[in-house]
Amino acid sequence: MSLKLAFGGKGGVGKTTVTSLIARTIAALNKGTSVIAIDADPVANLAAGLGIDETQPITPIAELSDLIAERTGAVPGTMGGFFTLNPKVDDIPDRFSIEKDGVKLLVMGTVLNGGSGCICPEATILKALMNHLVLARDEVVVMDMEAGVEHLGRGTSGSVDALVVVVNPGKRSRVAADKIRKLGKDIGIKNIVILGNRVKSEADKDLIRESMPDYEILGFMPELDEIVQSDRDGVRPFEDISNIPEELKAIALKLMALSPQ
């Protein structure tokens, strides 16, 4: 199965929890399917949602100085000068990912100088890796993005099967969704959908529907004690993924149906 999904949303809406649950659910429903989860949000912690032990060291790709220097021919932290703009990255997902229950995690990291658009070795590696993951891998790739979609360029965005914007009933998350959709459209993402999270009532669902009438609503996730308690305990929710609520399973199946193969 080949499927490329990006998840965005205002901080605090539960985007990372939703992303991890979708990745785990797809892996469980399709035994043998390769699922790669990309943590591309500097403040996210996708590892915890996937159940990866916090003592297990994870070095973000942007901080692998020796690898970046080897592949680009330039020392990380430098700008300008000459370096390779199309570095070899096809071995990175297998070499530097951590696997748990059929999901491989890759942490992208942050370019510390120059901003996301800087012409520097670290940014070049991250861009090349995202291009490879979206365009060249015949796998399920689930991306936990920043509030925007900065890691995706125009060259890769057309191959993203869906940008899923996670919202709560609150107004601020819905306003943020409008901004994220504009960013997504600007770089060529065609399928942008809404996932309502932490919904407590039919009134919450109606509020999201009525305030976002020109969006496709993928589905709604209820406020769940299991998720709240697992966050307090520092463990992943639904240790037995077969116990996920039907709403989440239905959302995962809808997303899987977007796969071109």
Regions found by a protein language model. Name each.
Residues 108-114, 118-119, 130-152:
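Switch II (G3) loop of P-loop NTPases
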